[in-house]
Regions:
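Peripheral, non-AAA+ core regions of ATP-driven protein-machinery
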Residues: 2-13, 17-79, 86-94, 99-106, ...
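Conserved RecA-like ASCE P-loop NTPase motor core of nucleic-acid helicases/translocases
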Residues: 119-123
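Conserved Walker A/P-loop ATP-binding site and its immediately adjacent core
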Residues: 124-130
Length: 453
C-alpha cells in the first residue's frame, strides 16, 4: 500500500542521495550532477529475498569442484573474461548504439545452446519477431534458448525462478523498472534498484546474468556510477560503428585481468573473431611513406603490432596545432618537448598530427619510442624501413627505459616477418637474443634516431 511520495535528489555520477538540491556532490565532488526524482514510500510486506538464510563457513570448507567456468564459444570473449564465464557473476556490457552489444550476446546465446545449456534472453527494446529476424541472420539456434519481452522486474524474477536457466541476458538495464519505484525506467533510482535485484538473483541462484548498458555522450554507462561498482565485470565495446572492427575491453573484472582485449570483425552474419589482431591492424599499410612506423604494445599477455602515423608540417598559425588520435594527447606533447630539447628538432613552429592506424586506442608507455621515431621520420621526410619494429618507454631526459615482456614482443615481430627490432638496451639479455632477427639496443632518443636514418 502506498503511504505517500517524497522528492529525492540523486547524483547522476555516483548515485549519492540528498533531500535537497546541491551544486556540488559530496560523494564524487562533481558539479551540477543532481537530478530530482519522486520516490514512493511502499510497504514491502509481500517482498521476499531471493537468498536463503545461511550460516558462516570457513574458507577451507568451501568446495570449488562445481565452480568451473563455462566456455562462451568465443575465444576473444573468454580471454577478456579471464578464461570463461563465471557462474553466478553479473556482467555489464556497455557501448555506443549500433556497436554490436546485442549481436555479441546473441551469438554467445547461440554457442551456449549448442552446448545444451538453458539460456533466457530478455529484451525490453525489441519484439519477439524482431529478435527472431536478428537470430536468423546469425545462424541456427538450439532448442534451449528461451525469449521473453518484458520490462517488469517482478515478472522477470518469477520467470527466472520458474525456468532456472544457467545464463540470462538483460537487454537493456535502462528499460527495466520496479513497480514500487514511481520514477521512469532509465532513471537513477530505477537503474540502481534493478541492478541490485539482478545481483541478488545472480548470487542467490548461481545464475550468470549479462546486462546491456547504454553509454552517455561522455562514453560511460548511463545511470549512476555505483552501477559499475555493483557488478562483477564491466566490459566496453569500442570502435567506429562505420568500420568493420570492434574492440572488447575489460574495465573491471573480479575474476581476471583488466588488461586483456578481444578483437572482432563485423560481418553480415554477425561478429567474427580476429585471432591475429597484429596482422589485422597492419593490413593496408602504405609503402615508402615517411612518418609511419610499426610499434608493439602489450594488451595483457597478448602482443599487438600497430602502425603509428605522424604528419609534421610548418604552421601558419600563431599557436601550432597538435592533434592525437588513438593515444594520449598530453603524452604526445611531452614527447615532442623531449625531441626539441634532447634531439635538437625545432618543432615549436610546426603543426603535429599523430594517429594510431586502425582506430585502436593505445596508451602503454612502450609505444613512446614509436611516436618519437614517427615524428622524426615525418619531420625529416625520411622513410623508415617497413621491416623495422620499435618499442620502448622514453623519459624526460631522452633516455629509453626498460619495458616488460620484451621477449614476447620480439617473437611476435619475427612471426609476422619483421627483420629488425629497435628496443631499449637495458632489455638486452640471453632471453631476448633470438636468432633470425636483427636486434638494435638503444639507450636514448639520439641513438634511436641514428638507427633509423
Amino acid at each position: 500500500m502506498v503511504k505517500g511520495k517524497k522528492t529525492i535528489y540523486f547524483c547522476q555520477n555516483c548515485g549519492y542521495e540528498s533531500g535537497k538540491w546541491m551544486g556540488q556532490c559530496p560523494g564524487c565532488k562533481e558539479w551540477n550532477t543532481f537530478v530530482e526524482e519522486t520516490v514512493s514510500k511502499t510497504e514491502r510486506t509481500n517482498a521476499r529475498s531471493i537468498r536463503e538464510e545461511k550460516s558462516p563457513v570457513t574458507l577451507s570448507g568451501i568446495s570449488l569442484e562445481d565452480e568451473s567456468r563455462m566456455n562462451s564459444g568465443m575465444k576473444e570473449l573468454d580471454r577478456v573474461l579471464g578464461g570463461g564465464i563465471v557462474r553466478g557473476s553479473l556482467v555489464l556490457v556497455g557501448g555506443d548504439p549500433g556497436i554490436g552489444k546485442s549481436t555479441l550476446l546473441l551469438q554467445v546465446c547461440r554457442n551456449l545452446t549448442d552446448q545444451k545449456r538453458k539460456v533466457l534472453y530478455i529484451s525490453g527494446e525489441e519484439s519477439l519477431a524482431q529478435i527472431k529476424m536478428r537470430a536468423k541472420r546469425i545462424g541456427e539456434f538450439g532448442e534451449s534458448l528461451y525469449l521473453l519481452c518484458e520490462t517488469n522486474l517482478e515478472v522477470i524474477r518469477k520467470a527466472i525462478e520458474k525456468m532456472r536457466p544457467e545464463v540470462v541476458v538483460i537487454d537493456s538495464i535502462q528499460t527495466m523498472y520496479q513497480e514500487e519505484i514511481s520514477s521512469a525506467p532509465g532513471s537513477v533510482s530505477q537503474v540502481r534498484e534493478s541492478t541490485s535485484i539482478l545481483m541478488q538473483i545472480a548470487k542467490g541462484m548461481n545464475i550468470t546474468i549479462f546486462i546491456v548498458g547504454h553509454v552517455t555522450k561522455e562514453g560511460v554507462v548511463a545511470g549512476p556510477r555505483v552501477l559499475e561498482h555493483m557488478v562483477d565485470t564491466v566490459l566496453y565495446f569500442e570502435g567506429d560503428r562505420h568500420a568493420v572492427y570492434r574492440i572488447l575491453r575489460g574495465v573491471k573484472n573480479r575474476f581476471g585481468s583488466t588488461n586483456e582485449i578481444g578483437v572482432f570483425e563485423m560481418r553480415t552474419e554477425g561478429l567474427a573473431e580476429v585471432e591475429n589482431p597484429s596482422e589485422f591492424m597492419l593490413n593496408g599499410r602504405p609503402e615508402d611513406a615517411s612518418g609511419s612506423v610499426v610499434a608493439c604494445s602489450m594488451e595483457g599477455t597478448r602482443p599487438i603490432l600497430i602502425e603509428i602515423q605522424a604528419l609534421i608540417c610548418q604552421s601558419n598559425l600563431g599557436i601550432p596545432r597538435r592533434t592525437a588520435a588513438g593515444t594520449d594527447y598530453n603524452r604526445v606533447n611531452l614527447l615532442m618537448a623531449v625531441l626539441e630539447k634532447r634531439a635538437g628538432l625545432h618543432l615549436s613552429s610546426c603543426d603535429a598530427y599523430i594517429n594510431i592506424a586502425g582506430g585502436i586506442k593505445m596508451n602503454e608507455p612502450a609505444i613512446d619510442l614509436g611516436i618519437i621515431l614517427a615524428i622524426v621520420s615525418s619531420y625529416k621526410d625520411k622513410v623508415i624501413d617497413e621491416k623495422t619494429i620499435v618499442f620502448g618507454e622514453v623519459g624526460l631526459s631522452g633516455e629509453v627505459r626498460a619495458i616488460s615482456m620484451a621477449e614476447q614482443r620480439i617473437m611476435e615481430a619475427k612471426k609476422l616477418g619483421f627483420q629488425r627490432v629497435i628496443y631499449p638496451k637495458v632489455c638486452e639479455n640471453e632471453r631476448t637474443r633470438i636468432k633470425g632477427i636483427e636486434l638494435v639496443g638503444v639507450s636514448n632518443v639520439r641513438e634511436a634516431i641514428r638507427a633509423i636514418l
